[in-house]
Design a protein with these regions (language model features):
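Acidic/His-rich, metal-assisted hydrolase cores and their charged scaffolds
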Residues: 1-248
């Protein structure tokens, strides 16, 4: 078994995505009379669905920014994973036909990526959107380790433009998509793997994850902390690192 280690240091359980939905309901009320811009991960379909639900409840149209966001939303609608009423999503060129307070922008850029839609808005380089004091912006994500400075720069520029900006440390607008300790322990208890390789995280996260498995009774010899490029071999009796290939 290989398992995500990102939240292996966090005790307890990961909060429900419904927490974010409840926050959106309150924030949409708070943003009455303003244009709403929400940046989140394009892969989080449930998060997008909650934004759609709030837009419908508040009689707002939705405009989508960012290639990955457009691709994911269109595919999710096509496959039936995302329920969007006909006519709710409008083309970018049609935004000016609606009052700003009747629009929700869903955009990429929650990690401060320099070429993302939100970053270009913040730097006043987006051809469709100019940030004004009438904008209410929600960054519905936590900075991935290493992206903190990029996100802070975007937030600062949005604030300088006069917008109100909401982010996770201020409000419950994000919950992790990674399992915390109790969920990891439940998974290990249910699956009872013979071999275990913690993945996805810094070394400290992999180390903590391996410790959880050993504390639950796994043989330490069957828990491997691998580095990028390690070759791992198993003969059904034993598992070990046997070599290295060029990677990264």
């Amino acid at each position: 078994l290989m398992a995500d280690s990102t939240n292996a240091e966090r005790p307890g359980h990961t909060a429900s995505e419904r927490t974010v939905g409840n926050s959106f309901v309150k924030l949409f009320d708070r943003a009455e009379g303003k244009r709403i811009i929400i940046a989140t991960f394009s892969s989080n379909i449930h998060r997008v669905q909650q934004i759609v639900n709030c837009a419908v409840a508040n009689d707002r149209k939705i405009a989508v920014f960012g290639r990955s966001m457009l691709n994911v939303i269109s595919t999710a609608i096509e496959l039936g994973y995302l329920k969007v009423p006909d006519g709710l999503i409008i083309d970018l060129d049609a935004m000016n036909r609606f009052p700003a307070e009747k629009i929700v922008l869903i955009t990429t850029g929650s990690q401060g990526e320099p070429m993302s839609a939100l970053s270009r808005m913040a730097m006043n380089e987006h051809r469709h959107v100019t940030i004004t004091p009438n904008d209410f912006i929600i960054i519905s994500a936590n900075p991935i380790p290493g992206n903190e400075k990029l996100v802070t720069k975007v937030v600062n520029e949005l604030l300088r433009a006069g917008a109100e900006v909401i982010y996770e440390s201020m409000y419950d607008v994000h919950v992790s998509g990674h399992a915390c300790q109790e969920e990891l322990k439940l998974m290990l208890s249910l699956i009872k793997p013979k071999y275990y390789i913690p993945v996805h995280g810094e070394y400290k996260h992999l180390k903590k994850q391996s410790g959880l498995a050993i504390d639950l009774g796994m043989d330490p010899n069957n828990v491997i902390i691998a580095s990028i490029g390690n070759v791992i071999e198993s003969d059904g009796v034993d598992m070990k690192i046997t070599g290295q290939v060029q990677a990264g």
